[in-house]
Structure formats: C-alpha cells, structure tokens
Regions:
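Ankyrin-repeat boundary/"N-cap" motif
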Residues: 73-79, 101-118, 132, 137-148, ...
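Intrinsically disordered, low-complexity eukaryotic regions enriched in glycine, serine
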Residues: 1-91, 95, 118, 122
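Conserved ankyrin/ankyrin-like repeat signature
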Residues: 88, 126-127, 153-154
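Ankyrin repeat domain, specifically the short helix-to-loop turn at the C-terminus of the second helix
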Residues: 93-99, 129-137, 156-164
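Leucine-rich solenoid repeat scaffolds
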Residues: 143-159
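Short glycine-/small-residue-rich flexible loop motifs, especially phosphate/cofactor-binding loops
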Residues: 57, 116, 128, 155
Length: 177
C-alpha cells in the first residue's frame, strides 16, 4: 500500500473532501478503500460502521501524519507561510515546538523541509527571523533553498545568522576575485 504525499501547497478543504469521499468508498465496500482502512487504522471498524473520524485517521496516516489533527496543523502551517501570516505561524509553532524541526509537508525527502526552509523557498524573511529566534536550526538547508529559488536577500540575511552553503562560499570568493 503506497503512501500519499501532500502537494507543495495543500488545501484543507480538499483534504476534508477526500476524507468524506474515502468514508463513502469504505462504507460502499470499495476493495481499495477497505484495504486502506485495514492498513492504516489501528483498530479498523467494519466498513458499514466506519465514521468520518475513521476516514480522517486513515487519510492522515496515508499522508504519513500521526493523526488528523496533526495533518490539519501541517496544512495550516504551510498555508500561513504561503500567506506570509507571521502571527499564525508563531501561534502554531509555539503551541507545538516540534514543528520547528519536522518537515512542513510531513513527508520524507521533501526539498521543502522544516518550516524555516519552507519559508526560505518563498523568501518569507520575517517568518524566517521569527522561526530562527524560536530555535529553528535548519539554516544550511534553508540558505540552499533560498539560493535555488533566487531569493538572494533572504540568503544574505541567513548568512548573517551563520548559515553557510558551498554556493555562498563560492559566490563570495567570486565576488572578491
């Protein structure tokens, strides 16, 4: 059974609809939906007795989240970074400091990384400063992502905070040559 991956900018309304659709498929006895229920649910109910909370848990775990609330939290965090909503980002990471160090998209091998790196991809400098002050430690991956996305001002700001990237060191040597 393969896992799902959140898109770069997930949509909570779409995930809610996916959960409802999954519940409908489970209750209807769709073999792949029932297999998913049995694979991802620790105590799967019989298909006719499945509730929305069961479908939400199955969906969350298929996205590699531990629970539906954790999946919702990830989507809210990513959405707040996209909207440059520093207050919502602060509220989410102070209520759950582990978020500072987990992949924002809850998927392994994501180039978007933890929230600081995710914000660097988008050039969200105020959010980066705030996350850094709160203890985010992924400056090296963040500076690399900022450079890849052409966010030079963001990369310079991170370099002043101690981030080092082979590209930055090379570029600095070239600027002085």
């Amino acid at each position: 059974m393969s896992n799902r991956e959140l898109p770069v900018r997930p949509n909570l309304d779409q995930l809610k609809q996916q959960a409802k659709d999954l519940l409908h498929s489970i209750r209807g006895g769709d073999p792949s939906a029932v297999d998913e229920l049995n694979h991802h649910h620790p105590e799967p109910p019989s298909p006719p007795e499945a509730k929305l909370a069961d479908a939400q848990l199955v969906l969350a775990r298929s996205y590699q989240a531990s629970s539906w609330p954790r999946l919702v939290q990830a989507v809210q965090l990513v959405d707040a970074i996209w909207r440059d909503d520093i207050d919502t980002v602060r509220k989410l990471v102070t209520s759950n400091p582990k978020l500072l160090h987990e992949d924002a998209l809850i998927r392994r091998n994501s180039n978007w990384g933890p929230p600081l790196t995710y914000a660097a991809n988008l050039g969200r400098d105020e959010i980066i400063r705030m996350l850094y002050k709160l203890g985010a430690g992924d400056l090296e991956s963040a500076i690399g992502r900022a450079l890849l996305q052409g966010k030079i001002v963001t990369a310079r700001m991170m370099a002043t905070r101690g981030a080092r990237d082979g590209c930055v060191l090379t570029a600095g040597a070239l600027e002085t040559a």
